[in-house]
């Protein structure tokens, strides 16, 4: 009877090989078993047995060419992911205060059925990105603007981009009726990377005072007269005119467009998670689900 120790070690070898193979493409020359066993610190025999079991399960097909080496001929990403032993997947999401965010969360949950997929909802894209980079979470949803402007974006990988207005509607300048020319105090939530970047660009060269305000309080603070204006995503259900407020849509500057696009981020070195997303999530199906949630056709489940 095969020992439990051998079975456990073969499982480790399978997981190691699966993670390695997920980063390879068909036609690529593979590392030798000797080199892989050295990297994994397991015997050559164990690595050979693990590779054979992956081939027998039809997770991969290997073409062996003697001295020229072995090449990846066929790959089944879904099967390999089962062997990769990824475990729970946690995605950092914005707080679900819009139907668009709820639609994304619900769509991801449904498309990743069969994988233990969970969400951590938190305010502030910089915080979500930091948690991703520090290994606290596996994925993070932010705007394209926040992802590209983050100081450590070289360590980020945009695993999926969803197009304009998939994250928010276009942001607008919100101010009290008839008071656009007298804007001096501008609300800013320092935890919102998007709002910081857009506010800085919109008011460049203008004599204003930035006032720290929670993003969700911007409208109330303008109405009460504590601030004069804010760059804000109007979204659904806000009767601005009835509240004595006006909006102005900024020019089609690149940063305002990028702030409306949702992207799903992974760490650049986390190939299995990137492959998981590519394998499980169909972009068009995700967007259709989101649009149906926004339209009220279906209720979000996440």
Identify the role of each PLM range.
Residues 1-32:
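Extreme N-terminal segment that seeds HTH/winged-HTH DNA-binding domains in transcriptional regulators
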Residues 27-40, 54:
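A short alpha-helical element within helix-turn-helix/winged-helix DNA-binding domains
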Residues 41-50:
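Short coil turns linking two alpha-helices in DNA-binding domains
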Residues 51-52, 129:
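Short, hydrophobic-biased segments on the C-terminal half of alpha helices
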Residues 52-104:
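HTH-adjacent hinge/linker in prokaryotic transcriptional regulators
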Residues 60, 117-120, 208-210:
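Generic structural signal for residues in well-ordered beta-strands
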Residues 99-120, 201-202:
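Short alpha-helix C-terminal cap/hinge motif
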Residues 123-125, 133-302:
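C-terminal regulatory/effector modules of DNA-binding transcriptional regulators
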């Amino acid at each position: 009877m095969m020992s439990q120790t051998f079975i456990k070690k073969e499982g480790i070898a399978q997981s190691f090989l699966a993670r390695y193979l997920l980063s390879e493409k068909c036609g690529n020359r593979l590392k030798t078993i000797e080199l892989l066993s050295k990297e994994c610190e397991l015997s050559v025999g164990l690595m050979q047995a693990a590779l054979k079991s992956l081939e027998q399960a039809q997770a991969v097909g290997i073409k062996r060419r003697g001295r020229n080496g072995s090449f990846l001929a066929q790959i089944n990403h879904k099967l390999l992911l089962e062997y990769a032993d990824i475990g729970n997947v946690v995605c950092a999401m914005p707080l679900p205060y819009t139907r668009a965010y709820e639609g994304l969360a619900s769509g991801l949950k449904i498309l990743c059925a069969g994988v233990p997929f969970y969400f951590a909802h938190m305010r502030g894209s910089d915080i979500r990105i930091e948690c991703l980079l520090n290994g606290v979470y596996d994925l993070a949803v932010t705007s394209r603007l926040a992802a590209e402007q983050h100081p450590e974006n070289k360590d980020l990988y945009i695993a999926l981009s969803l197009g304009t207005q998939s994250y928010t509607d276009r942001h607008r300048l919100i101010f009290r009726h008839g008071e656009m020319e007298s804007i001096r105090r501008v609300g800013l939530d320092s935890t919102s990377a998007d709002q910081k970047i857009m506010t800085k660009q919109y008011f460049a060269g203008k004599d204003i005072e930035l006032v720290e305000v929670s993003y969700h309080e911007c409208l109330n603070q303008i109405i009460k007269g504590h601030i004069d204006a804010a760059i804000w995503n109007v979204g659904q259900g806000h009767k601005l005119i009835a509240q004595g407020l006006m909006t102005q849509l900024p020019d089609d500057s690149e940063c305002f467009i990028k702030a409306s696009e949702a992207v799903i981020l992974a760490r650049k070195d986390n190939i299995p998670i990137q492959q998981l997303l590519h394998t499980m999530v169909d972009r068009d199906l995700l967007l259709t689900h989101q649009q149906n949630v926004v339209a009220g056709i279906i209720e979000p489940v996440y």
